[in-house]
Amino acid sequence: MTIINELDGAKVIKQTKNDATQKLSVMFFEEKKGVTIEVAITGLAIAKYEDEEETGLYLFMCDKDWAVQDDHKVETVEEAIAWAEKNFDITEEDWL
């Protein structure tokens, strides 16, 4: 299992395991030529930008390679965990 220290320049505070066989969600991206690309979300991470003046954290939704596909801004780790539990099939025990 890979432990991630940084994503998109933000310091990772907590993460789930990233198992390519477990799809937490699917995102669809439409390309210019009308082709739709499907990307499975297989891992989540809670992270903070150290140089950001404002407070808050981000819940990153990542693909199997830990590439960030989307994010959700939250104020606390607890809020991020609660939001993830509500929107994905995970529990507090899934966090590392």
Place the predicted regions along the sequence by residue.
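Negatively charged, low-complexity tracts enriched in Asp/Glu with abundant Ser/Thr
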Residues: 1-37
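Generic detector of leucine side chains in alpha-helical contexts
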Residues: 7, 24, 44, 57-59, ...
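Compositionally biased, intrinsically disordered low-complexity regions enriched in proline and serine
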Residues: 29-30, 50, 59, 89
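Short aromatic-glycine-(Arg/Gly/Cys) micro-motifs in beta-strand/loop hairpins
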Residues: 37-69
